[in-house]
Curated annotation (Swiss-Prot):
ATP binds at residues 957-965, 981. The keyword Lipid biosynthesis does not apply. It comes from Candida albicans (strain SC5314 / ATCC MYA-2876). MAP4K component of the MAPK pathway required for the mating pheromone response, and the regulation of cell polarity and cell cycle. Phosphorylates histone H2B to form H2BS10ph. Required for hyphal formation and virulence. It is an enzyme of class 2 (transferase). Residues 148-159, 612-626, 865-874 have a biased composition (Basic and acidic residues). This is Serine/threonine-protein kinase CST20. Its EC number is 2.7.11.1. GO terms for biological process: cellular response to starvation; chlamydospore formation; filamentous growth; filamentous growth of a population of unicellular organisms; filamentous growth of a population of unicellular organisms in response to starvation; fungal-type cell wall organization; intracellular signal transduction; MAPK cascade.
Amino acid sequence: MSILSENNPTQTSITDPNESSHLHNPELNSGTRVASGPGPGPEVESTPLAPPTEVMNTTSANTSSLSLGSPMHEKIKQFDQDEVDTGETNDRTIESGSSDIDDSQQSHNNNNNNNNNESNPESSEADDEKTQGMPPRMPGTFNVKGLHQGDDSDNEKQYTELTKSINKRTSKDSYSPGTLESPGTLNALETNNVSPAVIEEEQHTSSLEDLSLSLQHQNENARLSAPRSAPPQVSTSKTSSFHDMSSVISSSTSVHKIPSNPTSTRGSHLSSYKSTLDPGKPAQAAAPPPPEIDIDNLLTKSELDSETDTLSSATNSPNLLRNDTLQGIPTRDDENIDDSPRQLSQNTSATSRNTSGTSTSTVVKNSRSGTSKLTSTSTAHNQTAAITPIIPSHNKFHQQVINTNSTNSSSSLEPLGVGINSNSSPKNGKKRKSGSKVRGVFSSMFGKNKSTSSSSSSNSGSNSHSQEVNIKISTPFNAKHLAHVGIDDNGSYTGLPIEWERLLSASGITKKEQQQHPQAVMDIVAFYQDTSENPDDAAFKKFHFDNNKSSSSGWSNENTPPATPGGSNSGSGGGGGGAPSSPHRTPPSSIIEKNNVEQKVITPSQSMPTKTESKQSENQHPHEDNATQYTPRTPTSHVQEGQFIPSRPAPKPPSTPLSSMSVSHKTPSSQSLPRSDSQSDIRSSTPKSHQDISPSKIKIRSISSKSLKSMRSRKSGDKFTHIAPAPPPPSLPSIPKSKSHSASLSSQLRPATNGSTTAPIPASAAFGGENNALPRQRINEFKAHRAPPPPPSASPAPPVPPAPPANLLSEQTSEIPQQRTAPSQALADVTAPTNIYEIQQTKYQEAQQKLREKKARELEEIQRLREKNERQNRQQETGQNNADTASGGSNIAPPVPVPNKKPPSGSGGGRDAKQAALIAQKKREEKKRKNLQIIAKLKTICNPGDPNELYVDLVKIGQGASGGVFLAHDVRDKSNIVAIKQMNLEQQPKKELIINEILVMKGSSHPNIVNFIDSYLLKGDLWVIMEYMEGGSLTDIVTHSVMTEGQIGVVCRETLKGLKFLHSKGVIHRDIKSDNILLNMDGNIKITDFGFCAQINEINSKRITMVGTPYWMAPEIVSRKEYGPKVDVWSLGIMIIEMLEGEPPYLNETPLRALYLIATNGTPKLKDPESLSYDIRKFLAWCLQVDFNKRADADELLHDNFITECDDVSSLSPLVKIARLKKMSESD
């Protein structure tokens, strides 16, 4: 006989229908059937039952000698009345259940059942009817109902014989279940010709009755619906059939079963045996009182301790292993095993028997019961050959069964080699314990230890990511759009930066004016940004990224006012809740880097998460234990440096290094971070803590990036951690340069993480290398206030005092001067001294300055190498070198990029950082190439000679924006005085303007344009030799004299002549004003300063760029509209007002308000128009038409009466002399 479980292979059990009336367990699976065997004969169906509420070990019970003639015989008569009905139902199930026989077990079942049928041909319906209602077997007893025809003496004889055969086979456990039969078993079966007892250990009958009853109700439909016509010996599933059970019984009778009736034939009793799980009597609840059975079982088990050891080892017989289908089917013996007080000592034996006799593939998976007292080691069920295995229904058992299942399930399906599953007791016992360990793993994975597992998983996935995890979104390179200003329905501005608001208010533009002309305000603000000398720097200064700030002052400027509205410290856990919030100039991204450092170690007063917890918190939400360390999530919640000065000695470092900075990285843009005095002390005192910190910091890259803003700001500078920017770093390439900084930082940290246990980095190295990298995120972008962090292995870290407070303060200084003490330390921090901090800060700044210089030298070397390569490229392009030389130059031309120049910093920067670094370098190279092109162009324009040989007696007479102005004598003509404009090209922000000026002057030979004589390029300095106008500029005359309308008309006429010439050449001067109108002593007027002039051709007949001086600027330029040559006419009109009133309109206004007034007021109003003639007012009105289409051009104005009736140029000579004398007197 074998057991088949359709739904759950492990939920097979046999019990009496009377016993099943108590328990109704709806959670048990249905479909268990008992078949009499593959051979012909009546079939019996059984219903699976859940285990009783109390289960005891059957390790000793199965082999107990008391099983012969034990209370099983007394219970037989109680169930005879149910034989007929249950037999009919079992017949139906046998037909359907026999189809699930495993192929690997089919032949073995056939052989065993054939032996049973040949020895017991008289199996009859009566036998089935007598055996159907047998009670559950108690521990220490065996189900001898299958052999009920004999008496007790026969049972004892057979028991003795089987015991002998078991002892013989004890040493032959190596027989595998699917190959050979142990000789002892074969001998016992053939010699005794007895059927293996369908032995079932009695246990608490009340529990079995309830379980069987519930299973009968639940599973009757499934059994009736099961296919009846299936062949009895066909099965490919893992479920065990009753034929499998029968084969197990026939092959392992001497192992697990103690046959009670040696005279009965084997086949007849197997076929006539009636399962105790009789589904035919679902309503019967009559059952023997369980208490007596429990007592007997317990007594029996206590008496049979000594016998059990021997017999349990004997039960590891390979005969059971031949039919692995029972290996996982828990019998009622098993359940008694589980509740037995001796389970620990007997578990190994029981497990051995289970693995050898039954397949764990049939172990119950959905059993449920809260009353069982399974231990972790009673995983495998002791599957005796009894055909009454019941369903274990305990949660613990359920988990353990699953584990054992996974361990031993292969034996039930595959005919493994000899000795694979015939394990000895200790070995199987170990398997069982390993199953419980697996259960512990599951519980740790899904239970209360989930944090540990998740943290470990986060560690394993930390380096994948960015990653993350390591997913990073790069910032736009060289993006200049720092603010988007809109206008709402009320006419108010939205998104207007506070700096612009301040600028507008400081410029005198009221809110009312802004609402009246919102678009004009936006235009003039945009113009004001664009017209600054360095637009990028001006834009950054708007956000208080001042390039002129001291680099040694750290990231904090304690006295600087907030640049942006201060955010609240609205962080989870109130990390900085108690400290005041003050906005800081540094960007959120830079503070993010500071957060990475600040949160490295938790305050001892705070709950310190373990390394695992901290790693976990990086991938999960911050731990509530670390609530006080959480970072405020407001991006603008900055804290000034003074608030972070530690005010007490650092507490002793904790015994274990902690890396709990992860909390701050859930809010990467937060900038006010609680930090304890002991954080840096911990890292400085324990080198290993440095490595503990590194993994968390690496995580932050990956994970700490929740918002795109924080990720972008983080990325804004990471790769050039160890390469300082050039002393005057241009802002455009510096943005991508700084972008790669954080990646370089994380890559720098990864080596520390990987080698944390084997090669700890000294605290000083961590101090100088890793910790300093974080605050310096956007250094290259804004000349930020920290030196580039050195590599961890060779950083000239500042000396750290041996005392813990000094170490702490030094570490804090190295990390971030701006640190907010945790609220828990606020009181103590108030009273602590700060002199140590100041000393350490000084030392730190000195060390960082040295480091910056070192890195700057390195960068200079790289740049020199690139210049050399580029020179080689130019030589190749010009054909100066042959093909070989050209190829060599091209090979050298792409030098090792700066990001790759520092591979020691680690490869953890990620693709984004590397790509950013490459793009940044490409932009720098492009700019460098552009500069070289400009220089090359200048070389073609300029004279290659030495100007010192031609011009002598240089006297500096002025300093312009682009260089100094000198007077010199021409060697060829000593009476000829020339003006030399000397400019350092390296300091010129817009070199193309210089070229433009030279080209315009060189190609514009006109009496009213300053003559261009020559130009020289000498050692990087550009010398422009021009005609000298000794009278000075018109500004001197305007400021020192009062001009008549005739004199004004002369200036306008001469200027218009020059403008007409320029406009005819397609050149727009775009900067006509009194400063650019020069006079000589004779009163001749010439236009100069063509730096802002623009070329206009047929294609580009209009210009839209913002150039010029605001007060003389035309409205179309202020409004950023297209414009043409008539902008010079507007400027001429403003210059007329300047000559009339001594100053241009709105000169007393701020430039921004002047632009606003120009854009909104239109034509400026004269102070005293009545004192002017009609001609000049008409001429002025024509020049100052807001609509440039109505504005006159230079040629039209030259024909105006005001110009035609003006004075001669000689009238200006007295004014020039007066202005010169006054100027000289002022200089004296």
